[in-house]
């Protein structure tokens, strides 16, 4: 069996191919049809804009950003202490927001909102509600 497989493969001597034998290929590999396994829960599915998955993700992210801006950020800024002041310069993260909601806060709250949304979507898919 190994000798027939070696005769059907091309042989090389340096960069030049040597003569290929014309022996017929006998049962080296059988082609099996591809079968789909599972229901594709881990695959990415592009739904329309008003799909339930999209609405859950948008709602959870929006609620987390709203909670961060109006609930979490003002209380965090009130409890902050002065800390060590070595040099009085602008950090580059400050915005004109009166509550002090910065870019870092936006990214953090958006990330937490996405994590909550993914958990809700996967949980609902697991019980079959979506």
From Swiss-Prot:
Q: Which named protein is this?
A: Photosystem I reaction center subunit psaK, chloroplastic
Which residue ranges does UniProt annotate as crossing the membrane?
48-68, 103-123
| Localization of this protein | Plastid, Chloroplast thylakoid membrane
Q: Which SUPFAM superfamilies match?
A: Photosystem I reaction center subunit X, PsaK (SSF81563)
**Keywords assigned by UniProt?**
Chloroplast, Membrane, Photosynthesis, Photosystem I, Plastid, Thylakoid, Transit peptide, Transmembrane, Transmembrane helix
Q: What is its main location?
A: plastid
Q: Which gene encodes it?
A: PSAK
- Family statement drawn from the similarity comment of this UniProt entry: Belongs to the PsaG/PsaK family.
Point out the transit peptide region: 1-46
For this protein, the record's InterPro entries field holds: PSI_centre_PsaK_sf, PSI_PsaG/PsaK, PSI_PsaG/PsaK_dom, PSI_PsaG/PsaK_pln, PSI_PsaK_pln
Gene Ontology biological-process entries: photosynthesis
A GO CC term assigned to this protein in UniProt = nucleus
Q: By its UniProt entry, which NCBIfam families does this protein fall under?
A: PS_I_psaK_plant
Q: How does it sit in the membrane?
A: Multi-pass membrane protein
């Amino acid at each position: 069996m190994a000798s027939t497989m070696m005769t059907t493969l091309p042989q090389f001597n340096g960069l030049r191919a040597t003569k290929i034998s014309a022996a017929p290929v006998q049962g080296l590999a059988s082609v099996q049809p591809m079968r789909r396994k599972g229901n594709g829960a881990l695959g990415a599915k592009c739904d329309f804009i008003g799909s339930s998955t999209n609405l859950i993700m948008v709602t959870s992210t929006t609620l987390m950003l709203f909670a961060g801006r109006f609930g979490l950020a003002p209380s965090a800024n009130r409890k902050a202490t002065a800390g060590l002041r070595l040099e009085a310069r602008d950090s580059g993260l400050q915005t004109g927001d009166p509550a002090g909601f910065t870019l870092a806060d936006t990214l953090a709250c958006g990330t937490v909102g996405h994590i909550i949304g993914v958990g809700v979507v996967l949980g609902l898919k697991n019980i079959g509600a979506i």
